[in-house]
C-alpha cells in the first residue's frame, strides 16, 4: 500500500507522509498531493489499539452503514470479521456455533439466522463505523426498514456461490427508493463452488457500467482464490494467519488487472463529461482523479464500487473499511429527512452538529428486564441530563442513562454526538418512530415504512385463562417489532396476529414462552362468514307463559324478505287496527336484532334482511315488552329454514405484482383459489400487476405460497371488497366445521 510520488487520500497516510503541495478540496473530502516516504506505519494490521467505546466522535469521523442482502449471504460473518480486524474481539465466532456478536438473541442462536438488526461499532483509523447487521429472511423485513432509517449508506452483500438473489434485488430496490449510496461486497470468494467472475458479470449485465470493480480476487492454477488485488493501486495481498501481507502480483495476472482497471476507469469516466472524453481518447487518469471520480460517483449514485473477500479468513476486510472511510458519506453528507412542524407544514431536516439537540428512535428492544430505545442523534449533542420533547406526545422526556450497544452488550456513555448511534434506557413512553426534539424546534420525522402485514393466524394460550398474559406479552413484543399487528376479533372470538410470514409469527410464539412464560399456539384464523335469505316468507311467533298471577303474552306475524339496500336490518310496521299496540313495536325490533346475530345454517350473522310486522294480538294484562321480544325471536326461528338461507363469504380485491416469467403459475394458482382475473397491467419496474377478486377464505397461506411460486419476487396487496354467496358445493363443509366448533 506504500508507494512513492503518488497522490493518495490524506486520511490513510497523513500519519506517515509529508505534505509537499497545495490542498485540493473535493466536496467534503480533502485530497493532498503528497510525497510518500516508505516507512513503517504507526498501526499494525490485525492489532489496532482498542479505542474506548465511550469516546465521542465528531460527525466527520462517523460512518453509519447497514449490511443488506439475502439470508445466508454472509452479512453477520462479515461484521464478525470487521470486529476482529479492528481488535474489538479476540476471536471470531461462528453462526453455526451460536457465538457471534450480532446474533446473540436466543431465537437467533437456535435458528442460526438473524431476526433483528444488531449494532456493532468499529473504531478504525480514528473513525467510528457503526455497522448495522440486518436480517436477510424476508419475514423480518421490518428490521431492515428500521436500519435503513438509521444508516447513511449501505453495503450490499452477495455470495459468490449464489450470485444475484432475490434478497439482493430487494436490498438494491430499498436503496434506490431512498437514494442511498452503496457498495457491493461479493462474499465467500474462497469457498468451493464460488464463481466471482459469473457474479461480477451478472452485476454488470443487470446494473450496467455503474458497477465499478475496486477489489478483485487472485486465483492460482487450480482456480483457488489465494488473495485479492487493489485494482486502483494494482497491488496484491493475501492473508497469513489472519494478517494481511502484500505479495507480488502473480505472473500472468497483469492482463487481468488491466482489464479490471479499465472497467474501473470506465465507471469513473461516467461521473464526469471531461473524464469521459479523455477515456475515449485513451488517456490515463491520475490517482486523485480516480478517487475523486469514485467519491463523486458514490455520492451521486452514478457509480457503485464492488469489493470482495472472505469473512472466514478476513481477506478483503481492511480494504472494505478503507473504502468505507474514503468513499461513503458521513452523517452530515448522508440522508436528508422531511420533517413535519407543529403547524403541519414540512421542511427539510438537515443533520447539523451545531444545531439544537434532537434524536430519532429507530429501534426498540423490550423484554422482561427492561427496555432500550435505539437512537440516532440528528443534531447537536445529548447527555443524560438533556430534556427533549417527544414530538408525538408533546411530553418532556429526560434522557437519563445512555449507552453504546455492541450486539447485546451495553456500555454506558456520558454523551452522544451528532450523527452517532446509541441507546436510551427505560424510556417507557417512547416508541419506535418517535422524534425527540429541543423545545425550541419541535419537528416530527416521518414514521418507518413497514410493509403491510400479509399473513394472519389466530393465537391462543395452551392453558385457558392465560389470554391476558398472551395479550400483554404480544403488546410488549410489538414495541420492539411494530411490523406485526394484533387484533381481538369480537365476531370470531379470536386474537388474530398478522405479520410478514409464518417464521415471524413462530418467533413471536417462542418469545412469549422464553420471555413471559406463557405457552401459546397458532391456528388458522376463522373467516367471518355471513348468512342471508333468498326467499320471502311469513311466520308466526307466539310467546305465552302463565305461572300464577300475571303471565306473559305476545303474538306477532312477521314477513321476512331479502333486501340489497344495506347489511343492517330494515324493520317496518304495517299493523292496522291496533292488533299490536305501537309501544310494543320497539320490543319486536329488538327481538329480531338479537335473533339475526345467529343465522340458521352455521350461526353466522344474518345480513340483508327486511322484517315487516303486519299483524298479531295482545293481552291487556299479560302482554309486555319481553313477551313481544320473545315472540319476534320465535317468528324468526320459524321463518329462516323456509326462506332459502345461504352462506356469504368475504371477497377481497387482490393486486399481485410479479415478473412476467411467473405469470402462468400465478394465474393458474388464482384459478384454483376461485379467483376472477379482472385485468393485467405493466408497472414502472418492468413487472406485471395482476388484478383479481378472490375469496378471503382461499388466501390464508397466499403470502407463503406466492413466495414459493415466484422465488420471493412476487408481492401482493389484498383488501376487503364485499360479500358474495358461497358456491353450494363448498357450503356443506363450512356449515359442518362451524357446528363442530
Q: Could you tell me what each predicted segment is?
A:
Residues 32-34, 42, 49-741:
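Structural and coupling elements of P-loop NTPases
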Residues 7, 22-25, 44:
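Charged/polar low-complexity intrinsically disordered segments
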Residues 13, 23-25, 35:
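Generic short N-terminal amphipathic or hydrophobic helices
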Amino acid at each position: 500500500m506504500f508507494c512513492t510520488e503518488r497522490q493518495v487520500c490524506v486520511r490513510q497516510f497523513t500519519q506517515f507522509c509529508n505534505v509537499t503541495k497545495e490542498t485540493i478540496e473535493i466536496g467534503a473530502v480533502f485530497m493532498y498531493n503528497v510525497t510518500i516516504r516508505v516507512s513503517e506505519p504507526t498501526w499494525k494490521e490485525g492489532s489496532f489499539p482498542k479505542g474506548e467505546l465511550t469516546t465521542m466522535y465528531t460527525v466527520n469521523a462517523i460512518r453509519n452503514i447497514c449490511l443488506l442482502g439475502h439470508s445466508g449471504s454472509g452479512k453477520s460473518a462479515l461484521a464478525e470479521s470487521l470486529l476482529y480486524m479492528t481488535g474489538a474481539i479476540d476471536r471470531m465466532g461462528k453462526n453455526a456455533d451460536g457465538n457471534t456478536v450480532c446474533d446473540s438473541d436466543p431465537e437467533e442462536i437456535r435458528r442460526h439466522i438473524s431476526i433483528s438488526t444488531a449494532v456493532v461499532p468499529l473504531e478504525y483509523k480514528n473513525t467510528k463505523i457503526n455497522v448495522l447487521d440486518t436480517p436477510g429472511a424476508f419475514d423480518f423485513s421490518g428490521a431492515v426498514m428500521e436500519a435503513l432509517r438509521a444508516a447513511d449508506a449501505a453495503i450490499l452483500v452477495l455470495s459468490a456461490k449464489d450470485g444475484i438473489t432475490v434478497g439482493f434485488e430487494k436490498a438494491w430496490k430499498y436503496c434506490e427508493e431512498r437514494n442511498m449510496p452503496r457498495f457491493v461486497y461479493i462474499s465467500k470468494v474462497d469457498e468451493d463452488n464460488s464463481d466471482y467472475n459469473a457474479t461480477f458479470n451478472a452485476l454488470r449485465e443487470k446494473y450496467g457500467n455503474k458497477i465499478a470493480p475496486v477489489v478483485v480476487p487472485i486465483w492460482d492454477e487450480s482456480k483457488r482464490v489465494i488473495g485479492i488485488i487493489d485494482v486502483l493501486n494494482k497491488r496484491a495481498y493475501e492473508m497469513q494467519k489472519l494478517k494481511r501481507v502484500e505479495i507480488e502480483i502473480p505472473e500472468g495476472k497483469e492482463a487481468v488487472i488491466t482489464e479490471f482497471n479499465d472497467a474501473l476507469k470506465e465507471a469513473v469516466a461516467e461521473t464526469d463529461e471531461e473524464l469521459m472524453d479523455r477515456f475515449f481518447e485513451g488517456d490515463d487518469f491520475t490517482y486523485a482523479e480516480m478517487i475523486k471520480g469514485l467519491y463523486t460517483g458514490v455520492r451521486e449514485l452514478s457509480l457503485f464500487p464492488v469489493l470482495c473477500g472472505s469473512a472466514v479468513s478476513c481477506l478483503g476486510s481492511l480494504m472494505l473499511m478503507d473504502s468505507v472511510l474514503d468513499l461513503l458519506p458521513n452523517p452530515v453528507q448522508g440522508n436528508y429527512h422531511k420533517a413535519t412542524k407543529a403547524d403541519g407544514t414540512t421542511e427539510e431536516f438537515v443533520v447539523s452538529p451545531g444545531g439544537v439537540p434532537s434524536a430519532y428512535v429507530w429501534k426498540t428492544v423490550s423484554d422482561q428486564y427492561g427496555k432500550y430505545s435505539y437512537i440516532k442523534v440528528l443534531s447537536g449533542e445529548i447527555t443524560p441530563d438533556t430534556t427533549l420533547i417527544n414530538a408525538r406526545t408533546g411530553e418532556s422526556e429526560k434522557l437519563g442513562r445512555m449507552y453504546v450497544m455492541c450486539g447485546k452488550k451495553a456500555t454506558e456513555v456520558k454523551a452522544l454526538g451528532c450523527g452517532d448511534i446509541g441507546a436510551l434506557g427505560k424510556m417507557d413512553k417512547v416508541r419506535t418512530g418517535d422524534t425527540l426534539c429541543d423545545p425550541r424546534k419541535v419537528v416530527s420525522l416521518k414514521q418507518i415504512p413497514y410493509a403491510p402485514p400479509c399473513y394472519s393466524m389466530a393465537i391462543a394460550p395452551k392453558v385457558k385463562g392465560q389470554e391476558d398474559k398472551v395479550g400483554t406479552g404480544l403488546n410488549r413484543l410489538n414495541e420492539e417489532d411494530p411490523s406485526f399487528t394484533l387484533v381481538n376479533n369480537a365476531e370470531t372470538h379470536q386474537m388474530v396476529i398478522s405479520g410478514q410470514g409464518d417464521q415471524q409469527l413462530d418467533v413471536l410464539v417462542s418469545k412469549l414462552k422464553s420471555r413471559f412464560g406463557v405457552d401459546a399456539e397458532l391456528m388458522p384464523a376463522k373467516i367471518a362468514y355471513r348468512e342471508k335469505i333468498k326467499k320471502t316468507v311469513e311466520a308466526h311467533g307466539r310467546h305465552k307463559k302463565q305461572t300464577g298471577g300475571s303471565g306473559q303474552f305476545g303474538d306477532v306475524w312477521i314477513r321476512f324478505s331479502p333486501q340489497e339496500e344495506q347489511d343492517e336490518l330494515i324493520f317496518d310496521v304495517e299493523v292496522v287496527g291496533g292488533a299490536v299496540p305501537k309501544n310494543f313495536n320497539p320490543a319486536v325490533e329488538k327481538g329480531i336484532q338479537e335473533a339475526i346475530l345467529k343465522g340458521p345454517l352455521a350461526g353466522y350473522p344474518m345480513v340483508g334482511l327486511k322484517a315487516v310486522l303486519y299483524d298479531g294480538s295482545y293481552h291487556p294484562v299479560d302482554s309486555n315488552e319481553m313477551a313481544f321480544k320473545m315472540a319476534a325471536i320465535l317468528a324468526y326461528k320459524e321463518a329462516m329454514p323456509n326462506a332459502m338461507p345461504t352462506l356469504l363469504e368475504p371477497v377481497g380485491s387482490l393486486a399481485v405484482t410479479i415478473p412476467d416469467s411467473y405469470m402462468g403459475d400465478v394465474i393458474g394458482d388464482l384459478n384454483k383459489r376461485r379467483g376472477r382475473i379482472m385485468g393485467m397491467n405493466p408497472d414502472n419496474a418492468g413487472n406485471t400487476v395482476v388484478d383479481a377478486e378472490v375469496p378471503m377464505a382461499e388466501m390464508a397461506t397466499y403470502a407463503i405460497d406466492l413466495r414459493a411460486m415466484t422465488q420471493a419476487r412476487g408481492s401482493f396487496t389484498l383488501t376487503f371488497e364485499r360479500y358474495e354467496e358461497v358456491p353450494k358445493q363448498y357450503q356443506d363443509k363450512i356449515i359442518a366445521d362451524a357446528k363442530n366448533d
